[in-house]
C-alpha cells in the first residue's frame, strides 16, 4: 500500500502563498492518517478547507485544524468528537513532522501541528502521522507571521486542500 499524499494551498490575508504537500503514514497509524486525509478532502461534509492556522510559534510549530471555532478550542474527527491515541511509534524527529494536537491523552480531534524544529519532548504525548513532502519553504514563510505567544499577525488560511 502506498501512503496517501494530501495538499494544502495556503493563503495570507486571502493572497496565495503556496502549496504544502504531506505524506500520511497510513502504514504506521492508519486511523490517524485516514482522519487527516478525509478532513483534507472534505468527503464527510466537513473539514479543513477555509480554516486557519490559529497558532504559529516561530522556531517551534504551526498549528491549525480547528474548523468549528477557529481559535484552538474546537474541531472534530471523522470518528466523532474525539478519538484515542493510536500509537507513539513515530517520533518528532525534526522540521516538517505532522502531529496531532490534543488536550491530554486520547483527545484527538482535527487539530494538528507542523513542526519547524525537532520537538522530542512531545514524543509519547502527541501522535505523529505524517511529514511535509514538498513546500517546507511555505511552512517557513508561514512561521514569519507567528509570534512568541502564537498569535498571528495576518490570517493564515487553508484556501484549498485535497488528496493528490
Curated annotation (Swiss-Prot):
Cross-linked sites for Glycyl lysine isopeptide (Lys-Gly) (interchain with G-Cter in ubiquitin): 28
Taxonomic source organism: Saguinus oedipus (Cotton-top tamarin)
Single GO molecular function: cyclosporin A binding
The protein's name in its UniProt record: Peptidyl-prolyl cis-trans isomerase A
Known catalytic reactions: [protein]-peptidylproline (omega=180) = [protein]-peptidylproline (omega=0)
Pfam family, one: Pro_isomerase
Phosphoserine modifications at: 77
Cellular component terms per the entry's GO annotation: cytoplasm; cytosol; extracellular region; nucleus
Residue numbers carrying Phosphothreonine: 93
Gene that encodes the chain: PPIA
Role of this protein: Catalyzes the cis-trans isomerization of proline imidic peptide bonds in oligopeptides. Exerts a strong chemotactic effect on leukocytes partly through activation of one of its membrane receptors BSG/CD147, initiating a signaling cascade that culminates in MAPK/ERK activation. Activates endothelial cells (ECs) in a proinflammatory manner by stimulating activation of NF-kappa-B and ERK, JNK and p38 MAP-kinases and by inducing expression of adhesion molecules including SELE and VCAM1.
Keywords: Acetylation, Apoptosis, Cytoplasm, Glycoprotein, Isomerase, Isopeptide bond, Nucleus, Phosphoprotein, Rotamase, Secreted, Ubl conjugation
Gene Ontology terms: biological process: activation of protein kinase B activity; apoptotic process; cell adhesion molecule production; cellular response to oxidative stress; endothelial cell activation; leukocyte chemotaxis; negative regulation of oxidative stress-induced intrinsic apoptotic signaling pathway; negative regulation of protein K48-linked ubiquitination
Glycosylation sites: 108
Post-translational modification comment from the UniProt entry: Acetylation at Lys-125 markedly inhibits catalysis of cis to trans isomerization. PPIA acetylation also antagonizes the immunosuppressive effects of cyclosporine by inhibiting the sequential steps of cyclosporine binding and calcineurin inhibition. Acetylation at Lys-125 favors the interaction with TARDBP.
Entries under PROSITE patterns matching the protein: CSA_PPIASE_1, CSA_PPIASE_2
Isomerase among keywords: yes
